[in-house]
Every structure is written in C-alpha cells, then in structure tokens.
C-alpha cells in the first residue's frame, strides 16, 4: 500500500513539474514519446521499433512525424521515475555487472557498452549491447566457437547506418529466472575513434571496461 501511495505521489509531483516543460509540445508527439517509453521500459523494445509500435497503438497515420530519440529518452526516464523507481536501479546494476563480465571475457576485441544499459535507463526487459572493435571481423566469432558459446548470427544497422554483423547470445539470469539478450556488434578497429566522440549533449555514447567498472562503483541513485 505504501509503495503504491509513494508512486502516486511521485506521479502527481512530476506531472506538475513537467507541465510547463511540455506545454508547447504537440500533444500527439508527446503521446507517441510516452507510449514508446512505456514499450521500451516494459517490453524491452529498441527506440525505433518502440516509436513505430506507438504509432500503431495510438492509431496515428504512418506519415505522422515521430519524436526524436532524445525526447523519447526523456520520457523513458520520466516513466522509470514514476513507475519503477524502486526496482530499476537494482536491475540496471545487475545488467551492468553481467555486461562487465562479458566485456572482460571479450577484452581482446576492445568491447564498449552502449544502449540503455550504458545510458542508465535499462530494466530487466532490456538487452545488453556490446560493440567490439576487431582487427579481424571473424576473430570474435571464432572466440565464441572456441569457448563453446552458442549464438545467432544477424546483420543489423551499425553506428553510421552501415550493415554490421551481430552475434546474439541468450544469457540465463539465475536472479530473474529468465534469459537476457546479449548482442555483440562487430566493427573494424578503425571505427573505434569516431565511436567515442561525445554527442550533442556532451555525453559519451558508449564506454569501455574501465568506464563500466567506474559506474558500478557509484552508489545507486
């Protein structure tokens, strides 16, 4: 009862705090962002797919302008603060710990953590995305074979829109009794320099092993 009451109070307070912030935002764009945020947090969808699914759920036309990723990420943080502030920090820490284990395991391939687990918006429904920067594009795949690790192969959209190879592993979480998806995206070593350039908001879009260790040393927020 107390937890539900606290969530309700947070919702009321945040609604008031955000009213002015979003006053000039078109209502449909705001609804798309909020619906997409819910789909990301509760169903583990990636941003692009979540926005398209939100369009369908809201009955909007295919040509409706979509909110940018930054706006959806803001809505994700709002959704987490309203509905899962009690559980999300622990789930995020568990995912970052699992990511670090695999970064250390794949250390020869310059692993970098990206996506929601790096940004701090992941929940137990989120996948882990590691980007590997390899001298030989087949070397990471060979390493998995040598370790007896089962994986699925796919081609996905890369950092600059180019097709890249992705190796997907289903990791079992004893804590949650379910699988967590781990995606290893294979890049050329020369792609690493541009991949570390900060975004327009000044934040690093991904981090290496030392950066993830540092995150795990920080107290939960």
Positions of the model-derived regions?
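Short hydrophobic/aromatic beta-strand micro-patches
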Residues: 129-135
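Coiled-coil-like amphipathic alpha-helices with heptad-repeat character
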Residues: 2-5, 46
């Amino acid at each position: 009862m107390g937890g539900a009451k606290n969530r309700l109070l947070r919702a009321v307070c945040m609604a008031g705090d955000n009213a002015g912030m979003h006053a000039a935002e078109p209502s449909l764009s705001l609804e798309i962002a909020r619906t997409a945020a819910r789909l990301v947090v509760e169903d583990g969808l990636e941003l692009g797919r979540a926005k398209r699914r939100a369009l369908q759920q809201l009955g909007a036309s295919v040509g409706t302008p979509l909110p940018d990723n930054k706006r959806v990420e803001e809505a994700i943080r709002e959704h987490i603060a309203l509905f899962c502030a009690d559980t999300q920090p622990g789930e995020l820490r568990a995912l970052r710990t699992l990511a670090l284990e695999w970064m250390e395991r794949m250390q020869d391939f310059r692993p970098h953590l990206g996506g929601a687990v790096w940004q701090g918006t992941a929940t137990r429904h989120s996948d882990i995305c590691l980007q590997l920067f390899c001298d030989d594009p087949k070397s990471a795949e060979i390493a998995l074979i040598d370790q007896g690790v089962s994986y699925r192969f796919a081609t996905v959209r890369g950092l600059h829109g180019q097709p890249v190879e992705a190796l997907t592993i289903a990791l079992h979480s004893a804590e949650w009794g379910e699988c967590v998806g781990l995606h290893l995206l294979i890049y050329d070593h020369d792609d690493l320099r541009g991949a570390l350039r900060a975004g327009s908001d000044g934040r690093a879009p991904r981090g290496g092993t030392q950066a993830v260790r540092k995150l795990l040393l920080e107290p939960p927020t």
